[in-house]
Amino acid sequence: MNLHVISPGPLTTVQDAGRTGYAARGFRTCGAADGYAMRTANLLAGNPQAAGAAVLEMTLQGGKYQFDGGAVFALAGADMPAALDGRPVPAYTPLLARAGQVLAIGAARSGLRGYLAVFGGG
């Protein structure tokens, strides 16, 4: 399953749990800014063994994404209104998208960073 980016938010990045053990070599851990929200989205999307799996981290503004196959996904973090094919969908809930459906995520009403996790997120 691929997730096609139709239009990203201006500060949308791919994040994961970061890299540990490299500080002595000058590398910071980095990773998602809100690790709790990232892990929550991953767990809801069905990634419990990989709660640090890659997610989309959206700062202030979401974006528009199309699923090319069926997928379980979840949103967590900032309160960003979202709709799947024009129908509102809640955050903090496992959701199912079918092939061709478009997920539109709006601007944050509160909070700063929202997270989109998809089952199997690498």
Predicted regions and their residues:
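Conserved "landmark" site that anchors the functional core of diverse proteins
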Residues: M1-G122
